Every structure is written in C-alpha cells, then in structure tokens.
C-alpha cells in the first residue's frame, strides 16, 4: 500500500515507482505465508486492519481487509489442483474453519476448478486441513 505524504507516495505520484497488482500481491503473500508455515514460523497478522483513515490516505498499491484469507485460499486452490484430474468429481474433507478458504473469495476456487470440469463437495471433518476422495 502506498500512502499520501510519504517518500514512496511521491515516487508513485511522479511515475518512478509502480506498485504490484492485486493478483501479484496476493500471490506473493501466499508464497510467503507458505514459506513461513513450512519453516514453522507463525504468521500472526497479514495486511492491515480495516480503517477508513488508511483508505483515504492511500494513493496506490493494494489494500484488502481479507488479504490473509485470499492468500490462504490461493494455497488451497494449489493443493486441490495437485490432487484433481480434469473432469473429476471430488469430496474434500476439512475443518469447518477452512471451508470459505477452500471455496475462495466469491467462489473463485470453485470457479477455477469448474473451468477444468471439476466439481466438488465439502464435508466437515474436525481437525483436518484438506483431504480429498
């Protein structure tokens, strides 16, 4: 995120600096989150908490109140892509806290798999990250 009255803000406004797109940002966050998780480093917070003041001071870059959820959703899509064959029908088992991430923001993961002819149902299984049948 790029804020007014900062050095980065001035560079952005003068055209010297251009920020990442939303997709670049969310994919980078997903990669970093995955890297930290694999290293056993707990990521406590990702992004900024929702604030009208921050939004008013923003002149560029990416701000989304659900940045972490989107990053986690990208990682779930990658896991599902790794186990799914085109045209297949699957049941994914997961803890209830993961269901919205598996479906994706606005159904993004469901839509992405649907484009490959993949359909799936989700069943709750306490303590399970993701398991496919």
Model-derived features with residue positions:
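Radical SAM enzyme core and accessory elements
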Residues: 52-133
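C-terminal scaffold of the Radical SAM
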Residues: 1-88
